[in-house]
């Protein structure tokens, strides 16, 4: 009898240890429900965030499209202004107007310029007015527009000063192209028209400098050197 009672007592103890208490079961159920709710809430939040982000991106794209449609680009505006100004300048010239007269009509003769000031020369040679003047030179003499321009510039500034302007014009990226072509026209004139076969002749007759003191001249010496190279190349070519 005592043995049976002992067995029953052991069974009761085992049941008490392994069977979950009601409070524990309730806590576990609540935790599971909470986790499930949290997953649902997180998924909903992510969908809302994606929808909000997508909405903002669409709104931004619509605003950008509206700006591109309603406002022309700055480049287009500047192009229209430049085109209008060029047309106005071209309208100032007569079709058969002499190049020297056109130089004054386009107010190039009133532009401030120092013959050996690189910035001022570059601004002069790259100005819109000068470009319109070049276009007019092409109409007058399409075979040698730079020769015509050189002649007109020489009449205004003098041969030595034009040579100086061309030299410093080569130093600036903005004016280098036109300066190189004017230089070619000038060297051609010196060699084939004026018959200056040596750089020393140009140094003395055009630049009005003393050959014996050549190292005392800066710009003149550079022109002398450039023309000496031209003469050498021309002699070898012909």
UniProtKB/Swiss-Prot annotation:
Question: Where would you say this protein principally sits, based on its record?
Answer: secreted
Q: What is this protein called?
A: RxLR effector protein PITG_14788
Induction (record text): Expression is induced during host plant infection.
The organism encoding this protein is Phytophthora infestans (strain T30-4)
Function comment: Effector that enhances P.infestans colonization of Nicotiana benthamiana leaves.
User: Any domain commentary?
Assistant: The RxLR-dEER motif acts to carry the protein into the host cell cytoplasm through binding to cell surface phosphatidylinositol-3-phosphate.
Specify the signal sequence span.
Answer: 1-23
Superkingdom assignment? Eukaryota
Which family would the database say this protein is a member of? Belongs to the RxLR effector family.
Q: Where would one find coiled-coil regions in this protein?
A: none
Alphabetically list the UniProt keywords.
Answer: Host cytoplasm, Host cytoskeleton, Host nucleus, Secreted, Signal, Virulence
Q: Where can this protein be found?
A: Secreted; Host cytoplasm, Host cytoskeleton; Host nucleus, Host nucleolus; Host cytoplasm
- Keyword Transcription regulation attributed: no
Q: Where is this motif: RxLR-dEER?
A: 47-65
Q: Name one GO cellular component term.
A: extracellular region
């Amino acid at each position: 009898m005592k043995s049976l009672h002992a067995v029953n007592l052991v069974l009761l103890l085992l049941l008490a240890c392994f069977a979950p208490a009601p409070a524990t079961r309730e806590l576990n159920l609540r935790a599971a429900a909470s986790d499930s709710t949290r997953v649902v809430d997180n998924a909903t939040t992510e969908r809302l965030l994606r929808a909000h982000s997508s909405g903002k991106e669409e709104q931004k794209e619509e605003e950008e499209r509206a700006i591109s449609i309603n406002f022309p680009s700055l480049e287009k505006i500047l192009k229209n202004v430049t085109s209008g100004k060029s047309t106005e300048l071209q309208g100032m010239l007569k079709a058969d107007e002499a190049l020297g007269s056109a130089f004054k009509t386009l107010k190039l003769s009133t532009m401030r310029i120092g013959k050996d000031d690189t910035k001022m020369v570059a601004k002069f040679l790259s100005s819109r007015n000068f470009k319109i003047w070049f276009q007019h030179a092409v109409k007058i003499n399409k075979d040698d527009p730079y020769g015509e321009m050189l002649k007109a510039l020489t009449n205004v500034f003098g041969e030595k000063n034009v040579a100086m302007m061309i030299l410093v014009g080569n130093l600036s990226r903005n004016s280098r192209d036109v300066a190189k072509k004017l230089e070619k026209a000038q060297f051609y004139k010196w060699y084939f028209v004026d018959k200056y076969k040596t750089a020393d002749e140009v140094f003395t007759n055009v630049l009005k400098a003393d050959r014996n003191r050549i190292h005392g001249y800066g710009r003149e010496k550079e022109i002398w050197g450039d023309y000496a190279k031209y003469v050498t190349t021309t002699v070898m070519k012909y």
